[in-house]
Amino acid sequence: MPSNNFKFFLTWWLTQQVTGLAVPFMLDMAPNAFDDQYEGCVEDMEKKAPQLLQEDFNMNEELKLEWEKAEIKWKEIKNCMSYPAGFHDFHGTALVAYTGNIHRSLNEATREFKINPGNFHYKAFHYYLTRALQLLSDQGCRSVYRGTNVRFRYTGKGSVRFGHFASSSLNRSVATSSPFFNGQGTLFIIKTCLGAHIKHCSYYTHEEEVLIPGYEVFHKVKTQSVERYIQISLDSPKRKKSNFNCFYSGSTQAANVSSLGSRESCVSLFLVVLLGLLVQQLTLAEP
């Protein structure tokens, strides 16, 4: 008869294969992330994104409600600063919405995109956010701080990226304050060259937020234990080619990547089914 320890190990191992995370909250290159930079298809996406947004609204009620709230806020604040050429209301609304309540579900779906690409109902939102950061980024580098109640781990080898949009602040005291940081999680000290200062596009201007795109790669990583928390310094930022590009624009390249994503999704589905069957059989085998 299989022991409870064996059942636990089997369940744990298969779960790790499905999620693609060997260790929870591992700091790595986020291999499952949707990291589209929309290089070469901005014009196409500008035409297609409004339709994609409506499709996402039909499938994602939370996004629809948060977007409608953000539209109202954006109309109130959009004349408080000047914006670069090409920046429009969709970009501003997306940034405001992100600083609300939708960022958690968006980031979870973005980081684990390859596991279930067919259930990603943030297509236009991701595009507008990404494009907004590209337009607002002045190509200058800045040091920022990101506090989280999660304890991250790093293997000590290789470059890393967040794999999702990452909020940070120019003000260390903001990053280390509640509710962002409880003193037992992780404090990131980041040098970002692709992050954009979005203070004037936020519900919370006092946070001095700098939003970092998930595709920014950091080649120098230093970790240390400080009192009860982990401090991680990320430096030597670079912009590298993404695994996805123009995924929703309908281009040939997008179709090729889509096929890859579908194959990986099938493998994940198979492992989920296998997990359920094995656990069921082990349970039935007990006297």
UniProtKB/Swiss-Prot annotation:
Reaction(s) catalysed by this chain's protein: L-arginyl-[protein] + NAD(+) = N(omega)-(ADP-D-ribosyl)-L-arginyl-[protein] + nicotinamide + H(+); NAD(+) + H2O = ADP-D-ribose + nicotinamide + H(+)
Glycan-modified residues: 171, 256
Propeptide: 259-287
Effect of substituting residue 40 to S: In strain: NZW and C57BL/6
EC number(s) reported in the record: 2.4.2.31, 3.2.2.5
Pfam (any one): ART
Key word Disulfide bond present: yes
Top-rank taxon, per record: Eukaryota
Entry annotated with the keyword Hydrolase: yes
Disulfide bonds: 41-246, 80-201, 141-193
Keyword line: Cell membrane, Disulfide bond, Glycoprotein, Glycosyltransferase, GPI-anchor, Hydrolase, Lipoprotein, Membrane, NAD, NADP, Nucleotidyltransferase, Signal, Transferase
Effect recorded for residue 26 to T: In strain: NZW and C57BL/6
Protein residues bound to NAD(+): 98, 146, 202
Family classification: Belongs to the Arg-specific ADP-ribosyltransferase family.
Medical condition linked: A subset of Rt6+ regulatory T-cells may confer protection to autoimmune disease, and failure to develop this subset may result in enhanced susceptibility for autoimmune disease.
The name this protein goes by in its record: T-cell ecto-ADP-ribosyltransferase 1
Organism: Mus musculus (Mouse)
